[in-house]
Structure formats: C-alpha cells, structure tokens
A protein has these predicted regions:
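Formylglycine-dependent sulfatase
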Residues: 2-5, 10, 16, 20-442, ...
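Mature extracytoplasmic/periplasmic domains
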Residues: 471, 479-491
Length: 517
C-alpha cells in the first residue's frame, strides 16, 4: 500500500491529461475563423480616410487598414448590384453565371453561394440589410433561397437620419445574430448596407453631416463643377459614413465578446458611386472599389498596403479556404477566383504575386428602358494601370435611351447637371462621355486619367490587351466570344413590371417600376 500515493498521483495526472485533451478538441473545431463580410451599396474607390480622402470620414475602415491590409487594386467584374453580388457569392465571373450576369435577374438554381456551402459544413450563417439582388432566387423546387444567410432584421431606429438613409439598425441585428449563434460553432455574417444607394436627401451632407462645399478637393473630370454636384457628392459622403458607423459598432461588439481575434473582416462595396460615368458603366470609377481586410489571427504583418490586382471572384474561394473546405466538396459550381490567403501569409507590401497583374470586367443588361429589353455588352481588362474596353453594340447608348430617361444611370442632381451640358458647346464632351454613343474600342491610362475622359485607342496600340482579354474570355466559355451573346437579351427580367418597359412607355402606359432595394 505504500505505492498507493504514487498510483493516486498517476491517476490524477491521467485525469488532468484527459481533461486537457477533451478541452482541446472543441478548440480545434472552434479554430475555424468567423467571417464578417461588410458590403456597401454604391461606394467608389478612394473615398475613405485610409486612401487619403479628406471629405469622407471612415474610422472603422481606417482601423481595418491599420490592423489588416489595405488593397489598392480591387475590382468587381460588373459594376451593378445583382451581377456584382453574384460574382461575390459564387466565385465566378458574370459571363459564367448565365442569367445572373444580368441585373434584375432570375438567379439560376444551379449556382450555390459560399454562404449556403458554409451552412452545410458547420457554419452558422446570417445577414442583415441587402443580400444578393435585386432579383429572384429560388431553388429547383421553387422555394426562396437564403443566398446570404438567414435574415436578421428585427431592429430598426424609430426615425430616419435623412430621407435616404435606412432605419435598419444593422449593428443591432448583428448583435442578435451573435446571440443566436451556437457556442463553439463558427459563423459567417453578411452585412449589406443599403447606403450610399440613392435617393439622397439633398443638402443633408452640409445640414446634418457637418460638411462644407469647400471640403471637396476635386470634382471628377466627367461632371461639371457646380454647387449642386458638390452637394450631391457630400450627401453621398454622409451615407458612406453611416455605413462605416455600423461597421465600427460591429467591430466594437466583436472586441467586447472576445471574438475579434479570430474573425476575418472584409469591407468593400458592390460597385461604384451612383453617378454618371460610374455605377453601371465599366470605367475606373465604376468597377474599382475600396477593400480592406482584417484578421488578427490570420494576417501577417498588419498595416500593409497591397497593390496586387484582386477580383470579387476571389472572395468565395478565400472564405472556403480559411474554413478548411475543399471546393470539390461544397457542391458549388467550379470557382474561377483565387484565394487571397497567399497575400495574408506574406509579409510584403506593394506587388506580391506576379500573376495578379490584371482583372477582367464586363457589362450586359442592367436597368430597363432600351427597345426590346436590350443591354449594353462590354468586355474589358485592367492591366498595369491601363484599361481597355470593347463595346459590342456601338449603335446603342451606354446609359439607355432619351425616350425613357437614360435609366441605366440613377436620377440625381449630378445626372441633371451632366444632361444639361448637351446644349453647352464648351461642356458637351461631358454629356457625350456618359450618354453619347461610344466607339468599339476605348483605352485609358488610369495613372494619368483616372476619370477615363481621354480615349487613347486611336493613337496607342491595344492589340496585346485585346488579345489577352479575348483569349481568357474564350477559355472561360464566355457566350460573347462563342457567337451566343444574344442570350443575355433573351433572359427575362425577374419582375414582370421590368419587361418591355420601353415599348409599354412609348405606347402611353404609365409604369411604376419596382423600387430597387
């Protein structure tokens, strides 16, 4: 019996070891990171403090840039809500998504979203605000799909800050989601702000945002520099700040709960600002977007600025990668994008991965208003600071037709100001840039001409860019390259009130179109 104390000690040590092992097992499972994807609605590149902008205050994004990575060359493949978001959730380019390459589409059931895949592999998924859309998304059985997760929308403010800013308490809804998340289970949340989508309350940037007309250091070269345009820009800025405010509250809540360390947070926008020559076009201010990613546990050497070209099709494979999921097991259609984890693991700034030297862009049918529900097909490539565009249907206008009000560009004080330049000889080039007919080929030097106002295609060779663009599109099965591009005009709009809008309007019908959410 004199060995009894020794035996007791051995048993105690074994019990302690077992307890550590059993405790470590759920820790391994929980080691999968949480994912917070924050996407604004119509926010252009450069409009954040982290990029040096003085007339928009974005402390939350600025913090993410300091504590993570700030990207300078992030692009959506399509500068319109539905197709851009389709690229985000599938990891595929718009020409690989059938009807989902159009705006206001009927989303094909065959394309699974990364949120749906994560949910099937142990993640708790949810969203607030605007998910994929506008459009209709149902499964093969006709049931509505939760493309970006279960909706959390219970919390709203009693009144609006402005007529244009949503009452939705996005951060409050995020708190409800966190409360509902099972302990020990990783989660993925989609924060889809409705801001800075139009319409704005004119003058709210000055009246309620404590801004001054003189705060704006530069009006883009594609618009006239007027008080109305500057006010419009400040109203837009005030809405961007509202989006950032909720993001800041979400970061603070994660910190409070001790979950920020192992949460990958992404902040970006679906497309550029809702102004002429921006949203819905294929120029620099259309597809070039803000992007910062923070992940304390997973990003080496935070505070870096990365100049590699990044496409929105890279988000889905990144999220699957950090979740430890093989794409072949997800049930998703093959992914074209490339995970960003190589950049996360690097300690370099500037250009890191040699192959990330370009992105591909596109446009098909966006908003209503053209005869026969026609779109405006474009394919483009951005490489090493040069943007080359090929416009397939030069007889059509890029923003629609005057008879229905150029509906491919959102109504706004700036749109009104640009339309007015048609009658002003010294400013008519502004009208032509946004609403006039375009040549088949356009080439811009984004380093010298970020607003894409000087077409170099008549004096500088674009043959190499065109060749690379067309070859990659063919490899990816783009119908435009296979003589089947008309299919995009044949896909019906998701909502009946969108169909044959031009013919019905010309025929005298007064149509109250579905409001875009």
């Amino acid at each position: 019996m004199k060995d009894f104390p020794r035996i007791l000690l051995l048993v105690a040590l074994m019990l302690v070891s077992w307890s550590f092992l059993s405790a470590a097992e759920p820790a391994k499972v929980r080691a999968k990171p949480n994912i917070l994807f924050a996407v604004a609605d119509d926010w252009s590149f450069g409009h954040a403090g982290a990029y040096g902008c003085k007339w928009i205050k974005t402390p939350a994004m600025d913090r993410m840039a300091r504590d993570g990575i700030l990207f300078t060359q992030a692009y959506t493949p399509n500068a319109k809500c539905s197709p851009s978001r389709a690229c985000i959730i599938t990891g595929r380019n718009p020409w690989q998504l059938k009807a989902a390459g159009n705006h206001w589409s009927i989303f094909p059931p065959e394309f699974k979203s990364y949120q749906e895949a994560l949910a099937e592999h142990g993640y708790f998924v949810g969203m607030t605000g605007k998910g994929w859309g506008p459009g209709i998304a149902k499964n093969a059985a006709g049931q509505k799909r939760e493309m970006t997760g279960k909706s959390f929308e219970e919390r709203n403010f009693p009144s609006k800050i402005t007529k244009g800013i949503s009452r939705t308490d996005y951060a409050g809804n995020f708190n409800d989601f966190l409360d509902a998340a099972p302990k020990g289970k990783p989660w993925s949340f989609w924060y889809g702000g409705h801001e800075p989508h139009r319409g704005y309350e004119y003058g709210s940037g000055v009246a309620k945002g404590d801004k001054k007309i003189s705060d704006i250091d530069r009006v883009p070269a594609c618009w006239p520099d007027t008080e109305e345009v500057r006010n419009d820009m400040l109203d837009y800025a005030f809405e961007v700040e509202n989006f950032d405010l909720h993001l800041g509250r979400m970061l603070a809540e994660l910190e409070k709960r001790g979950e920020l360390h192992n949460t990958i947070v992404v902040v970006t926008s679906d497309n550029g600002m809702p102004f002429p020559h921006c949203k819905g076009y294929a120029y620099n201010n259309s597809d070039h977007l803000p992007l910062a990613i923070m992940w304390p546990q997973g990003i080496s050497k935070p505070g870096r600025v990365v100049d590699d070209y990044v496409s929105f099709i890279d988000f889905a494979p990144t999220f699957l990668d950090v979740a430890g999921m093989k794409q072949s097991t997800t049930g998703m259609a093959s992914i074209t994008g490339r995970s960003l984890t190589e950049i996360f693991k690097s300690d370099q700034s500037g250009r890191i991965i040699t192959e990330r030297d370009h992105v591909l862009l596109a446009k098909e049918r966006n908003d209503v208003g053209r005869p026969k529900d026609e779109g405006y097909p474009i394919r483009a490539i951005v490489k090493e600071g040069m943007l080359y565009l090929h416009n397939f249907e030069t007889s059509r206008g890029p923003a629609g037709v005057p008879e229905t009000g150029y509906k491919d560009t959102d109504d706004s004080p700036t749109k009104t100001a640009v339309l007015a330049t048609e009658k002003k000889p010294d400013l008519k080039h502004l009208f032509e840039a946004s609403f006039g007919k375009l040549p088949a080929d356009q080439l811009f030097d984004l380093r010298r001409d970020p607003d894409c106002m000087t077409n170099l295609a008549t004096t500088v060779s674009f043959a190499d860019l065109q060749k690379q663009l067309f070859e990659e599109l063919k490899q990816q099965g783009d119908p435009r390259m296979l003589g089947q591009g008309n299919i995009y005009d044949e896909y019906p709009y998701g909502f009946a009130d969108k169909r044959n809008f031009y013919e019905r309007t010309i025929g005298g019908e007064k149509i109250e179109a579905t409001k875009e959410e």
